[in-house]
Swiss-Prot record:
SUPFAM superfamilies: MoaD/ThiS. Belongs to the UPF0125 (RnfH) family. Pfam families: Ub-RnfH. This is Protein RnfH. PANTHER family: UPF0125 PROTEIN RATB. It comes from Pseudomonas syringae pv. syringae (strain B728a).
Length: 104
């Protein structure tokens, strides 16, 4: 007979801290259901779980309501980027050039 629940992990990293929670969810739970059961939104009130991008082991889940979880999977909640990564790289390179005394 199959277990009535499976164990999964939910992770989120805010600017201040990181949390990894191990959660038992009913077999057949979707990503969206597991996030609700995890209570992670209570620890991070700024999280809007209906709007956050999520993934499993680094792969984005396009439909969290339909994706059924398997035992041992890790749901990752992704934050929005605060700055454009290309612009950050340009600024970093410019600072490095200035430090070495090279023309920009």
């Amino acid at each position: 007979m199959a277990d009535a629940s499976i164990q999964i992990e939910v992770v989120y990293a805010s600017v201040q801290r990181q949390v990894l929670k191990t959660v038992d969810v009913p077999t057949g739970s979707s990503v969206r259901q597991a996030l609700a059961l995890s209570g992670i939104d209570k620890e991070f009130p700024e999280l809007d779980l209906s709007q956050c991008a999520v993934g499993i082991f680094g792969k984005v889940v396009t439909d969290p309501a339909a994706r059924v979880l398997e035992a041992g999977e890790r749901i990752e909640i992704y934050r929005l980027l605060v700055a454009d990564p290309m612009e950050i790289r340009r600024l970093r390179a410019a600072r490095a050039r200035e430090k070495r005394g090279l023309p920009g």
